[in-house]
Amino acid sequence: MENIVDMIGFYGLFALFFVNIVYLRKQQGYLWGYFIFIFVNEYLNRILKLIIREDRPHGYDKAVEVGNIYNGAHVYGMPSGHSQSVFFSTAYLWLVIESVPLLLIQLFVCGLTVYQRWKYKKHSISQLAVGGIIGILFANLVYYLIKKRIFV
């Protein structure tokens, strides 16, 4: 059971990416906006990591690490990219669809993702919280820009 939780937590951002694409497929303006800005969100995270330069917690567990991914901006932990991505996806889909059951499922995946990143000491609680807040704020900005621009 613990391995399933870890895998959902690790791959949560990919799962939410595909869920969002499926649910947004009939709303092309929002779909393209999401598709473009999820990648902008990733680069925003890298830029913030290079500006803030806060190290990851000491003693993080490399058990779920694939290769040496911690180079460049990924050496730093603030803000958490996983947290920022899952909360961006969740907030964006909520703003477009406003489905409570879907929101609860996505928040569950967000929770598992945050837990997994904290459990293996990839990030501190503050790094995870800041990542989540940035993801939510950026999703709101993107949603309102797209809504205004494409007159939805």
Task: Enumerate the predicted regions with their spans.
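A cytosolic-side transmembrane-helix exit/cap motif
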Residues: 50-59, 123-129, 148-152
